[in-house]
Amino acid sequence: MNDKTTSLHANVDQHEIDKFESVASRWWDLEGEFKPLHRINPLRLNYIQERADGLFGKKVLDVGCGGGILSESMARVGAEVTGLDMGKEPLEVARLHSLETGIPVTYIQDTVENHAAEYPQRYDVVTCMEMLEHVPDPSSIVRSCAKLVKPGGHVFFSTINRNKKAWFMLVVGAEYILNMVPKGTHDANKFIRPSELLSWVDETNLRSKNMIGLHYNPITDKFRLAPNVDVNYMVHTQATDNSDL
């Protein structure tokens, strides 16, 4: 496992970093603050594998990897994974967990913009899950992900729609009624409409291939994928020729 740390603080919301650093030690607690991420991870992984025609042997970058839940799961199925994040504590947790499990993942503390400048067209697959709504300029993240992927490669985004339903479900419901995540986890003003995300995608060499919603049923306590993108949603894009970037 190789590590690299670079000090660069552009397009970083320190409040968001601090928020996740404060609970980083419990990242791999299946019943803790990150329980929803553990619950949805099989759905995310299956979607990525199916849309990218498998991950075995592919170079994958997980942008905003946090404590490494998705990163490790992709490495477990044979991908060569690099996890990128600006949170020092979550990365330390990710590195320790990788050592414990023996699943190799390279973790780097850096911004995606800087990583894109250093490693253009390096990866077969780039994932950016539950991260866009936590940065000052999400469109910059989209552009950088586009630069990092090889021509023909796949980029996956997931975020939260900005509307009253999403606010009620994720802020009122998940934070205050069901206590699924810590209070203050979400800032509804930073939620991103699908039309906004797709407009940023269209400004790059990426082309949207699929969009799917992620749904939680509080009665059955189950997550599932479905066409409705009113709340949580994922977008699969594929790169064309990067020469114009």
Curated annotation (Swiss-Prot):
It comes from the Bacteria. One of its GO terms (biological process) is methylation. InterPro entries: SAM-dependent_MTases_sf, UbiG_MeTrfase. Coiled coil: none annotated. S-adenosyl-L-methionine binds at residues 44, 64, 85, 129. CDD domains: AdoMet_MTases. The keyword Secreted does not apply. The keyword Nuclease does not apply. Its EC number is 2.1.1.222, 2.1.1.64. Pathway: Cofactor biosynthesis; ubiquinone biosynthesis. It holds the Pfam family Methyltransf_23. It catalyses: a 3-demethylubiquinol + S-adenosyl-L-methionine = a ubiquinol + S-adenosyl-L-homocysteine + H(+); a 3-(all-trans-polyprenyl)benzene-1,2-diol + S-adenosyl-L-methionine = a 2-methoxy-6-(all-trans-polyprenyl)phenol + S-adenosyl-L-homocysteine + H(+). Keywords: Methyltransferase, S-adenosyl-L-methionine, Transferase, Ubiquinone biosynthesis. One of its GO terms (molecular function) is 2-polyprenyl-6-hydroxyphenol methylase activity. Belongs to the methyltransferase superfamily. UbiG/COQ3 family. O-methyltransferase that catalyzes the 2 O-methylation steps in the ubiquinone biosynthetic pathway. This is Ubiquinone biosynthesis O-methyltransferase. It comes from Proteus mirabilis (strain HI4320).
